[in-house]
């Protein structure tokens, strides 16, 4: 079996995702998949780059699901990766505004498509 590793920073600076192309799935750890994405030191620019690379890889290699480190039974899909990318782009363009809320040491969040993205403003907006 061959496993490919992709650097997927945003949740944390060192986040990685592991892909098994032969079996069409991957393991995303905390980088994706919990419907509660926490940007601990990450930025929306990083998340946009990470979701772009991940979506391209999933499309190219027919990856159907990414299994997260939390919330088993809730795998990440290509559509959710694309939704997270869109949400992030809207935050940086000013089209989407975050809500204030202290959770897990993060002071803001956005919510849509069944996904929370929690972050620290203004750091994550740079």
Model segments located where?
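Active-site HxH/HxHxD metal-binding segment of metal-dependent hydrolases
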Residues: 1, 34, 90, 94
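Metallo-beta-lactamase
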Residues: 4-83
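Accessory terminal helices/loops
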Residues: 52-126
